[in-house]
A protein has these predicted regions:
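ALDH superfamily catalytic-core signature
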Residues: 226-370, 433
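Rossmann-like NAD(P) dinucleotide-binding subdomain of oxidoreductase/dehydrogenase enzymes
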Residues: 78, 123-262, 390
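Residue-level signal for inorganic ion chemistry
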Residues: 30, 66, 88, 111, ...
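Short, well-ordered beta-strand elements within core beta-sheets of diverse protein domains
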Residues: 33-39, 53-60, 107, 142, ...
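Conserved C-terminal structural/oligomerization subdomain of aldehyde/semialdehyde dehydrogenase
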Residues: 29-35, 216, 253, 307, ...
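Hydrophobic face of amphipathic alpha-helices that form TPR/SEL1-like repeat modules
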Residues: 1-28, 114
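A short acidic/small-residue loop/turn micro-motif
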Residues: 15-16, 21-22, 38-42, 258
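Long amphipathic alpha-helix in the N-terminal Rossmann-like dinucleotide-binding domain
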Residues: 49, 71-82, 94-120
């Protein structure tokens, strides 16, 4: 069993101030795969002090120096990609094929993208006698989730490092293993002591201590809307910047002119990706009422092709959800959907056939769902798709936007101009037409209760920068 009982503070692996350990469970077996330490406010104080001290010099480093660090990180990351994938598989239950591709390479992609952007990034702008300067904001508190563990670490750390910030990272205590490897990569890449610090722990202790800390200049949080609200409340007394990427209940509008089989197949497969544990999952499929029965049959056929099994096997396409807490929540929502009268097309409560351990969920499709049902309103965060019939395009757009969330939207149409028109009316930060993937060079973030601020690409630099105007910079 792996042991990660130290924290990375000021360039050193150090013991926690007060020893307290937690077992990390492999969700596919329910057995412990690692032991970590849980930090305290005292550990946070040490990490923040190191980051604050390092900021004085690191904020003055050249673009070339920071590009070099990022490029060295990318080189080491690539060399260790197999270890990283295995850590992700163990900590959150991703099938090894997914862990080795989308999960691991997302973390690498944000590093290489940040290096590329930094080479051409403009930190100054002259306006007559005035100069506008973009400067690093300072010490950043970074709190990341378990569902895309290294993707979320990297899309915060890489831009913060690129612009000259220092930071303290609290990864999810449920899935912390890959973050430790990330710290090792930064250390080997020669990132100066104190620039990056890692303290593990839970939200009410380490997360709250970071959010409240007077020497932390900004907080970047990814997770549930409930937890994100608490981070903002804890940060409010010190008036620090807070950026958040939170929950979602994303609509997938199948327009009448779409290739129905391709659109439904794509939508179901996307919903099941990462076992439905993605904040931007297309969890509400909106289908023309007269095409609903055909769409149901297609969805059932796609679901039959899902391969549930051991996460170490290449043939497995769906792993477990991350924890017993998540499994119980998903089961309650599935049972609630049945009680509310939704039609079960496939799946349902309980473990999949042939599975007797692990937090596996039967991939489930509901139909005849109304947008007011709990399964249409709440973020289930599991492999559960709801199909909602509509009678007109206007009604579809109204249903799509009738949610407190606004992270993503999806539009399927055989006419690109038609799809563009509908996409422009969806209140969401990211809209995907006909299955288009998001690019790491475009902003990622949400409207409404899905958060604020943007990550990824050049827009991802903005949250880590302060804007200064210097008047009289040039003689009048």
């Amino acid at each position: 069993m792996r042991e990660y009982t130290q924290f990375y503070i000021n360039g050193q692996w150090v013991d926690p101030v007060t020893p307290k350990t937690l077992e990390v469970l492999d969700p596919s077996t329910e057995e412990a795969c690692a032991t970590i330490s849980l930090g305290s406010e005292a550990d946070v104080d040490l990490a923040v002090a190191a980051a604050k001290a390092a900021f004085q010099s690191f904020s003055q480093t050249s673009v070339e120096e920071r590009v070099g660090m990022l490029e060295r990180m990318a080189e080491i990351f690539q060399r260790r990609i197999g270890e990283i994938a295995e850590a992700i598989r163990l900590e959150m239950g991703a099938p090894i094929k997914l862990a080795s591709t989308a999960q691991a390479y997302a973390g690498l992609g944000h590093i290489t993208e940040a290096a590329k952007i930094l080479k051409g990034y403009t930190f100054t702008e002259d306006l007559g006698p005035h100069r506008v300067v973009k400067e690093p904001i300072g010490v950043c508190g970074l709190i990341t989730p378990w569902n895309w563990p290294l993707n979320q670490v990297s899309c915060k750390v890489a831009p913060a490092l690129a612009v000259g910030c220092t930071m303290v990272l609290k990864p999810s205590e449920i899935a912390p293993l890959s973050a430790y490897l990330y710290a090792e990569i930064m250390d080997e890449a020669g990132v100066p002591a104190g620039v990056f610090n890692l303290v593990n722990g839970d939200g009410p202790t380490v997360g709250e201590a970071l959010s409240r800390h007077p020497d932390v200049d900004m907080m970047s949080f990814t997770g549930s809307t409930r937890a994100g609200s608490l981070v903002a409340q804890n940060a409010a007394p010190t008036v620090k910047r807070v950026t958040q990427e939170l929950g979602g209940k994303s609509p997938n509008i199948i327009l009448a002119d779409a290739d129905l089989e391709a659109a439904v197949t794509r939508g179901v497969m996307h919903m099941y990706n990462n076992t439905g544990q993605s904040c931007n999952a297309p969890s509400r499929m909106l289908v023309p009422r007269d095409l609903l029965s055909q769409a149901e049959a297609i969805a059932a056929k796609v679901t039959e092709g899902v391969v549930i099994g051991p996460t170490a096997e290449d043939s497995t396409t769906m792993g477990p959800v991350v924890s017993k807490i998540q499994w119980d929540k998903i089961q309650a929502l599935i049972e609630g959907g049945i009680a509310e009268g939704a039609k079960v097309i496939c799946g349902g409560p309980g473990l999949p056939e042939g599975i007797d351990r692990g937090y596996y969920v039967r991939p489930t499709v509901f139909s005849d769902v109304s947008n007011g049902m709990s399964i249409a309103e709440q973020e289930i965060f599991g492999p559960v798709l709801v199909m909602i019939p509509y009678d007109s395009e206007e009604e579809a757009i109204q249903i799509a936007n009738d949610t407190p969330y606004g992270l993503a939207g999806y539009v399927q149409s055989g006419d690109l101009d038609h799809a563009r028109q509908v996409a422009s009316r969806i209140r969401a930060g990211n809209v995907h037409i006909n299955g288009a993937s998001p690019g790491m060079d475009v902003p990622f973030g949400g409207y409404k209760q899905s958060g604020n601020g943007r990550e990824w690409g050049a827009h991802g630099f903005t949250d880590y920068l302060e804007i200064k105007a210097i008047s009289g910079f040039e003689a009048a």
